[in-house]
Amino acid sequence: MKICFALSAAVLSSIPLFAEPVSGLVGPNATVQVSSTVPMEIIKEMLVDEGSKVTKDQKIVQLRNDREQMDVRISEKAIELKQWIARGHDRLFQEKMGSEEKALESKTDLELSRIQMEAKKLALEEKTILSPINGIVVKKYKQTGEMATQQTPLVDIIDIDTVDVTFFVKATVRKTVAEGQVIKVKIEELDGAEFEGKVNFVDPRNDAASGLVRVKVKIENKDYRIKAGMKGLAEFGK
């Protein structure tokens, strides 16, 4: 009887733990909510719609910028004049017909005007809102002509060029899972199509309530077949 029990224990210990697939949830690689870059301004034009694919630094919202454009043009003309004045004072100083003090004063005035123009250009650039990531616009909160503020979102953008599938596995599996490990994931909504991913995060904490460990698997998704919110199945502890 003892021999049978020992044999049974040996057989059970040789069976891989958690051989049954663990279900996980697909999430985007990144989610960004974009707001206005200035405290308050009228939207001159919304340049994207829901579903638009965008690239990093692409223009997505144009705020009203007529005043800033005018300020830059005025600064450019002022600099042209001050360049002419500075050259004249420098020439007079070189020919000993003018003072060094006047030449330095006009040169300093020119440099200050250039700095001021850079500040005006920055104010103009802030009126054009750029996408911070490559991705897809999934939510549009504002329309052309509405007010944009730093407290209210304009658009939501997600990046699903790669996706993260989040699993919660038993703590005993932790020792068999490591970052960089290749894991095969089946996506239920794609008729069980199998994708190869890599573990990119193993939570060093156990969930206090369930005792489970969070594990993330990253999968390449250049064709966008896998959607956020789908379910994935994977085996751990094999």
Which role fits each region the language model picked out?
Residues K59-V61, R67-E68, E188-G192, K238:
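Short, charged beta-turn/beta-strand-edge "cap" motif at the junction between a beta-strand
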Residues V138-K139, A193-K238:
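Structural microfeature recognizing short secondary-structure transition sites
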